[in-house]
Amino acid sequence: MLLTVLAVVGCFTAVNGHGYLTIPASRTRLGFETGIDTCPECSILEPVTAWPDLEAAQVGRSGPCGYNARVSVDYNQPSEYWGNEPVVTYTSGEVVEVQWCVDANGDHGGMFTYGICQNQTLVDKFLTPGYLPTNEEKQAAEDCFLDGELKCKDVSGQTCGYNPDCTEGAACWRNDWFTCNAFQANTARACQGVDGASLNSCKTTIAGGYTVTKRIKIPDYSSDHTLLRFRWNSFQTAQVYLHCADIAIAGSGGGTTSKSTTSTTSTTSTSRSTSTSAPTTTSSASTATPICTTQASLIPVTFQEFVTTMWGENVFVTGSISQLGSWSTDKAVALSATGYTASNPLWTTTIDLPAGTTFEYKFIKKETDGSIIWESDPNRSYTVPTGCSGTTATAAASWR
């Protein structure tokens, strides 16, 4: 028995550094930014079967939102700093950019996925202040998130390859999940190779982070408050990483409409992170969904860019449509640093764009001497959602 215990302890301590969801802001990220979580990349479900069967592992105490044993924080229940309100509002059918951060010392390769559970009654158990879901409820929710998988192939034009560390015919041979590159590749290896971003393009506490960016399509569903679940299955180790972000979905075009009824008030701390969009509602009380009588011709799209800048540098967005200057740096739209802090380098601007428009864009930095610094390739792509009057959207990203 003693040997068994020592072996398990060794499994928990042998490998340092891992990954966590950053855009939209996960509960883990908010815990990190408020100082509660000292290692956001360390919420780990282990030891479990993570490969080649991606769905075999039971989530146990980790649940769909993660448990960090290092700091004894269970992200499956709201706290003062997360879980009381959405951090961003998406629109049904919208294609959005999502991002996670992998630590340089714990890039285990493998595959990852996102999901939205459309059983609001079940999700509400993870939104109720003071209530910790049971392990059975946690597993039921994870099963629901797997059923509500947001497939790579749902986004038109997105490259959805097979994992090079998987063998054809094995359970991991699938391209509905997103894949990292070959674990032992000489260049652009593993998960850090997906973006090819520079070290410290996102923040971890062990060895510095690399961004991993993809696009997902929001389902035909609406909710004042629900969860986006991120899951990464490691190829190298017997580990799974689970994280949740509190989101809202507006403007369902015909899918099930369900509203949270778990609480009528929200608690907001003055030290709460300012890096995320304000919610569109201040209460999660049940309300009737209005019938859409007027389709919006213009949608306010908020561009959020997380980029560290020097004094005198300014950030702009430009792109393939006239509203973004048609790639002219002279006509690029300036972002505001009103919410910028050293730990949360956020630049934002909101632009009214024609509903349904698809375009490419990039962020640029203008130096004090007038020189221009462009983000690395490839161009970003975005499709403005369609919806009722009052629909808004957010395009969030980190500099690359």
From Swiss-Prot:
Family matches, as CDD domains: CBM20_glucoamylase (cd05811)
EC numbers: 1.14.99.55
Activity regulation remarks: Activity is inhibited by both beta-cyclodextrin or amylose that block the access to the active site.
Modified-residue entries (Methylhistidine), positions: 18
Keywords associated with the record: Carbohydrate metabolism, Copper, Disulfide bond, Glycoprotein, Metal-binding, Methylation, Oxidoreductase, Polysaccharide degradation, Secreted, Signal
The CBM20 domain, residue ranges: 293-400
Glycosylation sites: 119, 379
Protein name: AA13 family lytic polysaccharide monooxygenase A
The organism of origin for this protein: Aspergillus terreus (strain NIH 2624 / FGSC A1156)
Domain Chitin-binding type-4 residues, every copy: 18-247
Reaction equation(s) it catalyzes: starch + reduced acceptor + O2 = D-glucono-1,5-lactone-terminated malto-oligosaccharides + short-chain malto-oligosaccharides + acceptor + H2O
Residues that bind Cu(2+): 18, 108, 241
Biotechnology: Starch-active PMOs provide an expanded perspective on studies of starch metabolism and may have potential in the food and starch-based biofuel industries.
Family: Belongs to the polysaccharide monooxygenase AA13 family.
Annotated coiled-coil segments of the chain: none
